[in-house]
Amino acid sequence: MGKTQKKNSKGRLDRYYYLAKEKGYRARSSFKIIQINEKYGHFLEKSKVVIDLCAAPGSWCQVASQLCPINSLIIGVDIVPIKALPNCITFQSDITTEDCRSQLRGHMKTWKADTVLHDGAPNVGLGWVQDAFTQSHLTLQALKLAVENLNTGGTFVTKIFRSRDYNNLMWVFQQLFEKVEATKPPASRNVSAEIFVVCKGYKSPKKMDPRLLDPREVFEELPTGPDNNEAKIFNPEKKVRRRQGYEEGDYTLFHEMPLLEFIKNEDPINTLGTLNKLSEPPQDDHEWKILKKSKLCTPELLECIKDLKVLGRKDFKHLLKFRKQARDLLGLDAKEETQEIEVEPLTEDQQIEKELQELTEKQKQKARKAKKQSNEIKQKEIQRSQMNMLTDMNIGIEAAQIGAESLFNLKTAIKTGQLEKLSKGKKKMIFNDEEIMKDNDINFDEEADANSEDEIDELEAQLDDMYNSYQNRRAERDANYRAKKLRGDVDDEGWEGIESDKEGSDKETEANDYEMESESDSDDDEHIQRIADQRKKELSKNAKVFFASNSIFGELGDEALLEEMNKKEAKTNQVTNENAVGHANDISNKPEQMEVDSSDSENDVSDDSDFEIVPNAPDEELSDSDSDNENDVSRKYSKAKDQQSKVDIATVEAMTLAHQVALGHKNKHDLVNEGIHKYSFRDHDDLPEWFVDDEKRNSKIVKPITKEAALAIKEKQKQLNARPIKKVLEAQGRKKLRALKRLEKLKKKSDMINEDSAKSERDKADEIQKLMKKLTKKQKTKPKATLVVARGSNRGLSGRPKGVKGKYKMVDGVMKNEQRALKRIAKKHKK
């Protein structure tokens, strides 16, 4: 007998068939999922739970068991039985039934699938249209099962046929997944209509529209719109072919209509789009005789209507113009005459009935509107209760109504004439005109005020404690802030118009009391003079030390600086000398003036110089108080000299100001004027510390800086950075100290040797030289062992590694971990 040959139709026994046999796969379709997995980021390697729908004979389950992590859950289901597979759970069921869903839930427990695979197809052979629809319906059922079991971000791979329902399925996939892509792996035959859709990133919506998974909704055929006959008429060159066969009930391709019927038709464009020819009417027709007399009825037009499919846009326009003119000639478009209808006036009963109907309709509208509003309120209340928004909406309305009467009213203050007192900062009550006219006494609840004041004081104390704790926490966390706090930079006040807070507050209180008690003009003048005296303030102590300690102000001279710092003391001396000695005429005739350069004197004249000519009494007539004042001045000047090293120009603004003062661009009056701005005279009394600190930090005048000042500060910072750190300086100092100690020791020993009379001078010199060599000899440091990592060519090496000289030590990662463990244990025992 001859050897039988197996059929090889459509290339079924291709290379993937033999590869599947060699690899042990149950079908050649195994390579389809392998290629899809490689193309789309190896999603199977990341999946712990995989469901294979329509899994028979189980080739995709085999691939999943090989690629998925160990101990993964792989479930295969099909309508036909599947042979048992290692590391897989298989059962027989129809994926469109509820039994399949219950069995899947029983196997998966509370788990969710990371990947759902579907490679099912119906029994084909009935017809291509029927087979394609059945495949699409099966794919939709698989998607429905996948949606119930997929985890968020999961993957769904399915097989579908290219058919008219393909776009509908793709739209459904795009609603449920972030990325949807169709592919055809190389293992799929080219003659096959199958393609695979990979859906990644399942969105897991909280609410699912059931119509997305309903076959009747997804595969519903929408009615096609009417043909675009306008395009056929106005753009006949562009033809769209639709190969869909004949229309129902119409099996002819040639359509003809009489010309007069076309003229009488109300829809000429759609009619022309469906016709092939317009037939000419008989010659004895009365209407046609009228139309033939028209100028547009030419022999060319009669030839054009014999074949409408070859006409162009111009010909169709000419035909439509002829139709319009023909309708005018035949009177088809004539407007109907309007008939006037007389309306009888309404009787009294009819008028009353009409008004009643209107009122009834208005009442119904109001009732509907009120019902609608009540429904909206109920709906809002339901929403608020669902969102736990149960707070009463009317809360605070009563308090607002009560407090509205006590609000400050500027118009009332202007009418009552109390605006002037309010502008001076007096906390007065503003009363209404009626209360002032009645002169009623306004009684306050003293207990309520006391309680409210106690609560306010308690709240302020709590705020102060919280601010202090915040400052302490910040000081512990931030070293720079801690250093600033120790230096006192944090608490420095920018304005020093009053020498002490106590003095300023006392004076202000006295001024307030004085103004409330007296109303005469003389008292007001004295009060104004007192305020002006308070605002006059010289440079502060720190400012004087600053100008005295910097060399950049050397042009002013030490004597001028001394005189400027103690101008008030000199004035006091003058008054004292006049009262004590009584030589006013001699003192006034013989003043002792300062020696100032011509350039300085010119500046003094033009700029209201900072220096003042002060007459002094002769030395022999000076009293004890004068000598004491001179001692105080010299003592303060020496103290300023002592503090010179402590003052430093550290900011660009300070350096800019120093340059301007040194070069004569600014004098004392300019500095005083710049110090008076909108932030200068703010009342800081009885304010919490946190508020004052915030005001200091934010309420500042931004002063301009110069390029030269910035460069000077930058150069200064460079010099500071170039200095060695404290540890290096300390080490150098210790080294020098040790050298000095050795030198002293050598000196003592050499003195002892020189005092020894038993030795000769040569022996003494030799011993001293030996001592010097011994002390100056450098200490030898032990060479450190070279560490060689046991890796690469040095792994498992016995003997000295290549290129290593001297002592060496072999190390590896295990030794490193052991050393870390030993350090950790030692640290633990120390605790």
Swiss-Prot record:
Q: Which UniProt keywords apply?
A: Coiled coil, Methyltransferase, Nucleus, Ribosome biogenesis, rRNA processing, S-adenosyl-L-methionine, Transferase
Q: Which SUPFAM superfamilies match?
A: S-adenosyl-L-methionine-dependent methyltransferases
Major localization class: nucleus
Top-level EC class as recorded in UniProt: transferase
Q: Name one GO molecular function term.
A: rRNA (uridine-2'-O-)-methyltransferase activity
* Cellular component GO terms, alphabetical: nucleolus; preribosome, large subunit precursor
**Gene3D superfamilies according to UniProt:** Vaccinia Virus protein VP39
Q: What is its EC number?
A: 2.1.1.-
Write out the biased-composition intervals (Basic and acidic residues).
Answer: 499-510, 632-645
The reply to whether Coiled coil figures as a keyword in the UniProt entry is: yes
Q: Which GO terms describe its biological process?
A: maturation of 5.8S rRNA from tricistronic rRNA transcript (SSU-rRNA, 5.8S rRNA, LSU-rRNA); maturation of LSU-rRNA from tricistronic rRNA transcript (SSU-rRNA, 5.8S rRNA, LSU-rRNA)
Source organism superkingdom: Eukaryota
Q: Which reaction does it catalyse?
A: a ribonucleotide in rRNA + S-adenosyl-L-methionine = a 2'-O-methylribonucleotide in rRNA + S-adenosyl-L-homocysteine + H(+)
Give the span(s) annotated as Disordered: 492-535, 565-645
Active-site residues, Swiss-Prot/TrEMBL: K159
For bias type Acidic residues, the affected ranges are 511-526, 594-611, 618-631
**Protein residues bound to S-adenosyl-L-methionine:** G58, W60, D78, D94, D119
What is the documented function of this protein?
Required for proper assembly of pre-ribosomal particles during the biogenesis of the 60S ribosomal subunit.
* Subunit relationships: Component of the nucleolar and nucleoplasmic pre-60S ribosomal particle.
Question: What HAMAP family does the database record attribute to this sequence?
Answer: RNA_methyltr_E, RNA_methyltr_E_SPB1
Q: What is this protein called?
A: AdoMet-dependent rRNA methyltransferase SPB1
